[in-house]
Amino acid sequence: MPADVMEKNSSSPVAATPASVSNTPDKPKTASEHRKSSKPIMEKRRRARINESLGQLKTLILDALKKDSSRHSKLEKADILEMTVKHLRNLQRVQMTAALSTDPSVLGKYRAGFSECMNEVTRFLSTCEGVNTDVRTRLLGHLANCVNQIHAMNYPAQPQIPSAAAPHPAYGQPMVQLPAAAPQSSPAPIACKMGGPPVEAAKVYGGFQLVPASDGQFAFLITNPAFPQNGSVIPLYTNSNVGTALPPSVSPSVMPSVTADSVWRPW
């Protein structure tokens, strides 16, 4: 009997062990386990965001380039990104050209800023340890080439047409595109109207001479060296009731009067 009792007592804790284990609550997940379980969900959301942004970018770039979206419905992601990069570079060139036409000092400021950044990178690479010598040499060489290209850039200033010219009510404002060239002062006086006093010629733009009149009108005279100095000139007036412009070697009293129908006009 005592032996049987001892066997029952010794076996009772073992039999009770599974019941105690089943009643214990589940252990909380660690941070690494939580990241592993949520990684597929985060990856799915990330891909959805990328695809949504690429879809919007495709619509915007096709509208900006004025291309038919039906013909480019199956564009690859790499094509969309390349088209976007090219479009942004073109916009940057246009904005830089517009800024230089209004403020010629923009190019100098850009050069100074780029040179300052290059000097800062050079100082950092010269004092930083652990940078490969080959990488440092290639980086500094690339920046030096960029500086040379920037200093070689030359955007000529666009000439400003005086705003005092009043157009004729029957015609629109004449638009004359001049070649980009540095203005040069012309000391020779030119009479712009029949019988009027000679007016000092203000500037010369790339072979075209801007001659302001006393009443606010203006004319462009061809002064290219290929033409003789005593040859005829082509006046462009904003008014039809004017005479021809005369070179300084011709007197107004010698020239016959010219009617409005014989004057060449761009319109």
UniProtKB/Swiss-Prot annotation:
Compartments where located: Nucleus
Q: Using the record's annotation, list all stretches that form the bHLH domain.
A: 34-91
Q: Where is the Orange domain?
A: 110-143
* Keyword Nucleus assigned: yes
Pfam families listed in its UniProt record: Hairy_orange, HLH
Q: Which SMART domains match?
A: HLH, ORANGE
Gene Ontology cellular component list: nucleus
Q: Which domain of life is it from?
A: Eukaryota
Composition bias (Basic and acidic residues) maps to 26-35
Q: Fetch the InterPro entries from UniProt.
A: bHLH_dom, HES_HEY, HLH_DNA-bd_sf, Orange_dom
Here the disulfide bonds are none
Which terms does the record give in the GO molecular function aspect?
A: bHLH transcription factor binding; protein heterodimerization activity; RNA polymerase II cis-regulatory region sequence-specific DNA binding
Could you tell me the keywords of this UniProt record? Developmental protein, DNA-binding, Notch signaling pathway, Nucleus, Repressor, Transcription, Transcription regulation
Q: Which PANTHER family match?
A: BASIC HELIX-LOOP-HELIX TRANSCRIPTION FACTOR, HES-RELATED
Task of the protein: Transcriptional repressor of a subset of early mesodermal genes including myod1 and t/bra. Binds DNA on N-box motifs: 5'-CACNAG-3'. Acts as a negative regulator of myogenesis, mediating Notch signaling to repress expression of myod1.
Q: Subunit structure, per the record? A: Transcription repression requires formation of a complex with a corepressor protein of the Groucho/TLE family. Interacts with the bHLH protein hes2, and binds DNA in the form of a heterodimer with the bHLH protein hey1/hrt1. Interacts with the bHLH protein hes6; this interaction may inhibit the transcriptional repressor activity.
UniProt domain comment: Has a particular type of basic domain (presence of a helix-interrupting proline) that binds to the N-box (CACNAG), rather than the canonical E-box (CANNTG).
The protein depicted here goes by the name Transcription factor HES-1-B
Q: Identify the species of origin.
A: Xenopus laevis
